[in-house]
Structures are given as C-alpha cells and as structure tokens.
Amino acid sequence: ILDGEEISQKPIHNRALSGLGRTFQNLNLHDDLNVLEHALLGLDRNMKYGRIAESFRMPWVLREEKNAHYVAAELLDHMDLLEYWNEKVEDLPYGLQKRVDVVRALATNPSILLLDEPAAGLPTAEALEMMEKVQEYANHISAGVLIIEHNVELVAGVSDRIIVLDAGKTI
C-alpha cells in the first residue's frame, strides 16, 4: 500500500506511476540525451495534459513545461549538475552519470525512492556526498529512501535504520 492505494495488483507498467522513483544497479541512461533531458524525463511522468492539448501547444501545456524546466534546473543545481545541463551523459564521468540517474528518479517526485547500489563503482567519499544530497532532496519532497547497498560505511553514514539480509532472511 502506497499513499493509501494498493499497488501490488496493478499492471506492472502502472506501478511505476504510483509514487515510486528508482535507480538500477547498472546505469539505465539514454546516451543520446543530455543531462537536462534526463531530468525532464522524470518530470514528464507528472504532467497532466492530453495529446491534443500537447499537439496544439495550449497555454497550460506551455506553463507546465516552463515549470518543469524550473524544477529540473533546481534539482540539477542541488545535485551539482547544473553546469553540465547540455552535456550528453555518455560524455560525463561515471560518478556524474550516477547522479544523473538519481536526478531522473528524484524528478518523478516520488513518495518512495528505491536506490539499487547507488554507490557501485564510486569512491566512498563521492558516494557519501551524493547520498547526502539525495537525502536532503528527499526530505525536501517528503520522500522515503530505500537503499540496497553493500558499502556498509556509506549506509551507516546516511541511514536512519539498517536492515541486513542474508540468504533472504533478516539478521
């Protein structure tokens, strides 16, 4: 149950629209998109207009798009990515690509943010800095964060509660 709604019985493609933001262990970015476009992908999920209104560029569509750009810029700035807004993600270092992936998930304005190995391949200091920024923004939008991570030092530095699993059992 998420925000008072049973989501487990929804079709899988609708569950993603139910207040969950997520990243994957392996980056799932589009190399042909720039950093801003990735943030806008997340925001696009929340826009509430139909294809006809979009086709005719109705005033409320233009307002929502302008607001989406503002929110995207705010989020990119918070995650120290604003200076890279027009860079293709394939041209960025791995650590910045991880941040772009997280930005796209945060841009969905989730109730719960699921992060699968967000620190994989990053030095602990860089991962900790990124996760502190994620936690700040999650607090700003009142989102819970669930981290699946093997880096115990990172988890201890950013978590309110830690649950350890071994062979599928809580220990």
Language model features with spans:
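Glycine-rich phosphate-binding loops of nucleotide-dependent enzymes
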Residues: 1-171
